């Protein structure tokens, strides 16, 4: 007769807030938890401990994080806090003194030490063989975020990221490429390259290290962004770049896009167009030069999609400054644009600047900005009608098929609604050809 002993692994609840960079941190912590034998559950009720990975970028994010911590304490009582807001331990303790432990962002080892302290590591681990080679992922199986560096060396006056996440710290190129290959080998069709400042990759390293030859897959490579992108382009997946600061060497990425090595998509946070406002933000700013570069980029790669973000209502922004921004939008004809009303952030230099813009003026400028950009976006999407585009499928239900074109990043851009008239077998993650038949200011419609 055989006797089987039951095994119950400790349960860990997990709450992940914030941006894609924080999501990558959550994925790494979850991977280590599973590797150590813990069971991850989606509820507070049966959790032996709850981890809350917080965001602290703007005040509304801080409030959301504090509320999430409070909810976890109320529902469970045993809470460890990590993430960006964790860098402000006193602020958390003032509101939630019963939190067990607090760590800052990307403090993976410290988080695991705290978990082991309150919920000892299981002696027997039935999950080791179940942890996939690419680690635990919180995104759908067909796309994943690839974080290439941590921190930021810029001192933008509206931002506190350097104080939360530290100075720029680039990952070794072979480590990034190894992770990317594991992801693609696991079935990932699209890699979204993220960091606080993607175009600064490897600039924190000495010239000697940047020029040092290393080997990956038997090929000699250098440690820089262009080489990284060129090698990523050999993996057979869509490679999409986010958070690209407009350094001069970004120009060298455009030929790779024209050659089809990486997606013709550039996410560049320009923030404003008024030289005065840009100077106050401590952002680089020659509008004429930016426009010249955009024109050149489009000449080299006509299919290029440009996404950017802007801030309206920054302290000292006058109507003249705002009009410069509108004029820039009209001339630049950007494809995808996000706009934020300036929000004071504790610890940011701009929070204490003179000439704060009244909230009603911010709102009015936001509405005017969005109205103009919606017209521009609609006009640019109209130009896609009649074309046949590759579309990656994100969702299939009784209402139809939803995907994204090369011009659409998940969560932040538009989608493509697909009518499967051919009734061909289509699965989530497939990349199919779609004939575009209609468009509005955000989305496309088409048939396959």
UniProtKB/Swiss-Prot annotation:
Keyword 4Fe-4S: yes
Molecular function (Gene Ontology), one example: protein methylthiotransferase activity
Domain annotation Radical SAM core: ranges: 138-379
Sorted UniProt keywords: 4Fe-4S, Cytoplasm, Iron, Iron-sulfur, Metal-binding, S-adenosyl-L-methionine, Transferase
Catalytic activity: L-aspartate(89)-[ribosomal protein uS12]-hydrogen + (sulfur carrier)-SH + AH2 + 2 S-adenosyl-L-methionine = 3-methylsulfanyl-L-aspartate(89)-[ribosomal protein uS12]-hydrogen + (sulfur carrier)-H + 5'-deoxyadenosine + L-methionine + A + S-adenosyl-L-homocysteine + 2 H(+)
Occurrences of domain MTTase N-terminal (ranges): 10-120
Co-factor: note: Binds 2 [4Fe-4S] clusters. One cluster is coordinated with 3 cysteines and an exchangeable S-adenosyl-L-methionine.
Binding site for [4Fe-4S] cluster 2: 152, 156, 159
A GO CC annotation given for this chain: cytosol
Annotated localization: Cytoplasm
Cofactor: [4Fe-4S] cluster
Residues at which [4Fe-4S] cluster 1 binds: 19, 55, 84
Record-linked InterPro entries: Elp3/MiaA/NifB-like_rSAM, Methylthiotransferase, Methylthiotransferase_CS, Methylthiotransferase_N, Methylthiotransferase_N_sf, NA-bd_OB-fold, Ribosomal_uS12_MeSTrfase_RimO, rSAM
SMART domains in the cross-refs: Elp3
GO process annotations (BP): tRNA modification
EC number: 2.8.4.4
Gene3D superfamilies according to UniProt: Methylthiotransferase, N-terminal domain, Nucleic acid-binding proteins, tm_1862 like domain
Domain spans labelled TRAM: 382-448
Function: Catalyzes the methylthiolation of an aspartic acid residue of ribosomal protein uS12.
Family: Belongs to the methylthiotransferase family. RimO subfamily.
Descriptive protein name: Ribosomal protein uS12 methylthiotransferase RimO
Recorded name of the encoding gene: rimO
């Amino acid at each position: 007769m055989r006797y089987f002993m039951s095994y119950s692994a400790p349960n860990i609840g997990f709450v992940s807030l914030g941006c894609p960079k924080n999501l990558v941190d959550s994925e790494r912590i979850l991977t280590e938890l599973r590797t150590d034998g813990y069971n991850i559950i989606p509820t507070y009720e049966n959790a032996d401990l709850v981890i809350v990975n917080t965001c602290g970028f703007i005040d509304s994010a801080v409030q959301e994080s504090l509320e999430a911590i409070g909810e976890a304490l109320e529902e469970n009582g045993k809470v460890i806090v990590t993430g960006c807001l964790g860098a402000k331990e006193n602020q958390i303790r003032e509101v939630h003194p019963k939190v067990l432990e607090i760590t800052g962002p990307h403090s993976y080892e410290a988080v695991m030490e705290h978990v082991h302290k309150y919920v000892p590591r299981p002696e027997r681990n039935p999950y080791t063989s179940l942890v996939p080679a690419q680690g635990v992922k919180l995104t759908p199986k067909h796309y994943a975020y690839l974080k290439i560096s941590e921190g930021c060396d810029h001192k933008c006056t509206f931002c506190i990221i350097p104080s939360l996440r530290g100075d720029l710290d680039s990952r070794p190129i072979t480590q990034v490429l190894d992770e990317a290959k594991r992801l693609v080998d696991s079935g990932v069709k699209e890699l979204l390259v993220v960091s606080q400042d993607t175009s600064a990759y490897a600039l924190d390293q000495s010239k000697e290290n940047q020029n040092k030859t290393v080997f990956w897959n038997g090929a000699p490579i250098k440690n820089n962004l262009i080489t990284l992108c060129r090698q990523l382009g050999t993996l057979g997946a869509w490679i999409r770049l986010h958070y690209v600061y407009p350094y001069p060497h970004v120009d060298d990425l455009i030929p790779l896009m024209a050659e089809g090595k990486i997606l013709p998509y550039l996410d560049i946070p320009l923030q404003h167009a008024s030289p005065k406002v840009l100077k106050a933000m401590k952002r680089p700013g020659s509008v004429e030069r930016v426009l010249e570069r955009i024109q050149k980029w489009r000449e080299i790669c006509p299919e290029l999609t440009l996404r950017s973000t802007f801030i309206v209502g920054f302290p000292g922004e006058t109507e003249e400054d705002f009009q410069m921004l509108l004029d820039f939008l009209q001339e630049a004809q950007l494809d995808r644009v996000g706009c934020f009303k300036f929000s004071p952030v504790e610890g940011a230099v701009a929070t204490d600047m003179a000439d704060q813009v009244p909230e009603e003026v911010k709102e009015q400028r936001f509405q005017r900005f969005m109205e103009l950009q919606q017209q521009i976006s609609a006009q640019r999407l109209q130009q896609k009608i009649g074309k046949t585009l590759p579309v990656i499928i994100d969702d299939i239900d009784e209402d139809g098929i939803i995907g994204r074109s090369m011009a659409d990043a998940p969560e932040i851009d538009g989608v493509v609604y697909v009518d499967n008239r051919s009734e061909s077998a289509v699965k989530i993650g497939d990349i199919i050809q779609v004939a575009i038949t209609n468009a509005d200011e955000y989305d496309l419609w088409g048939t396959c």
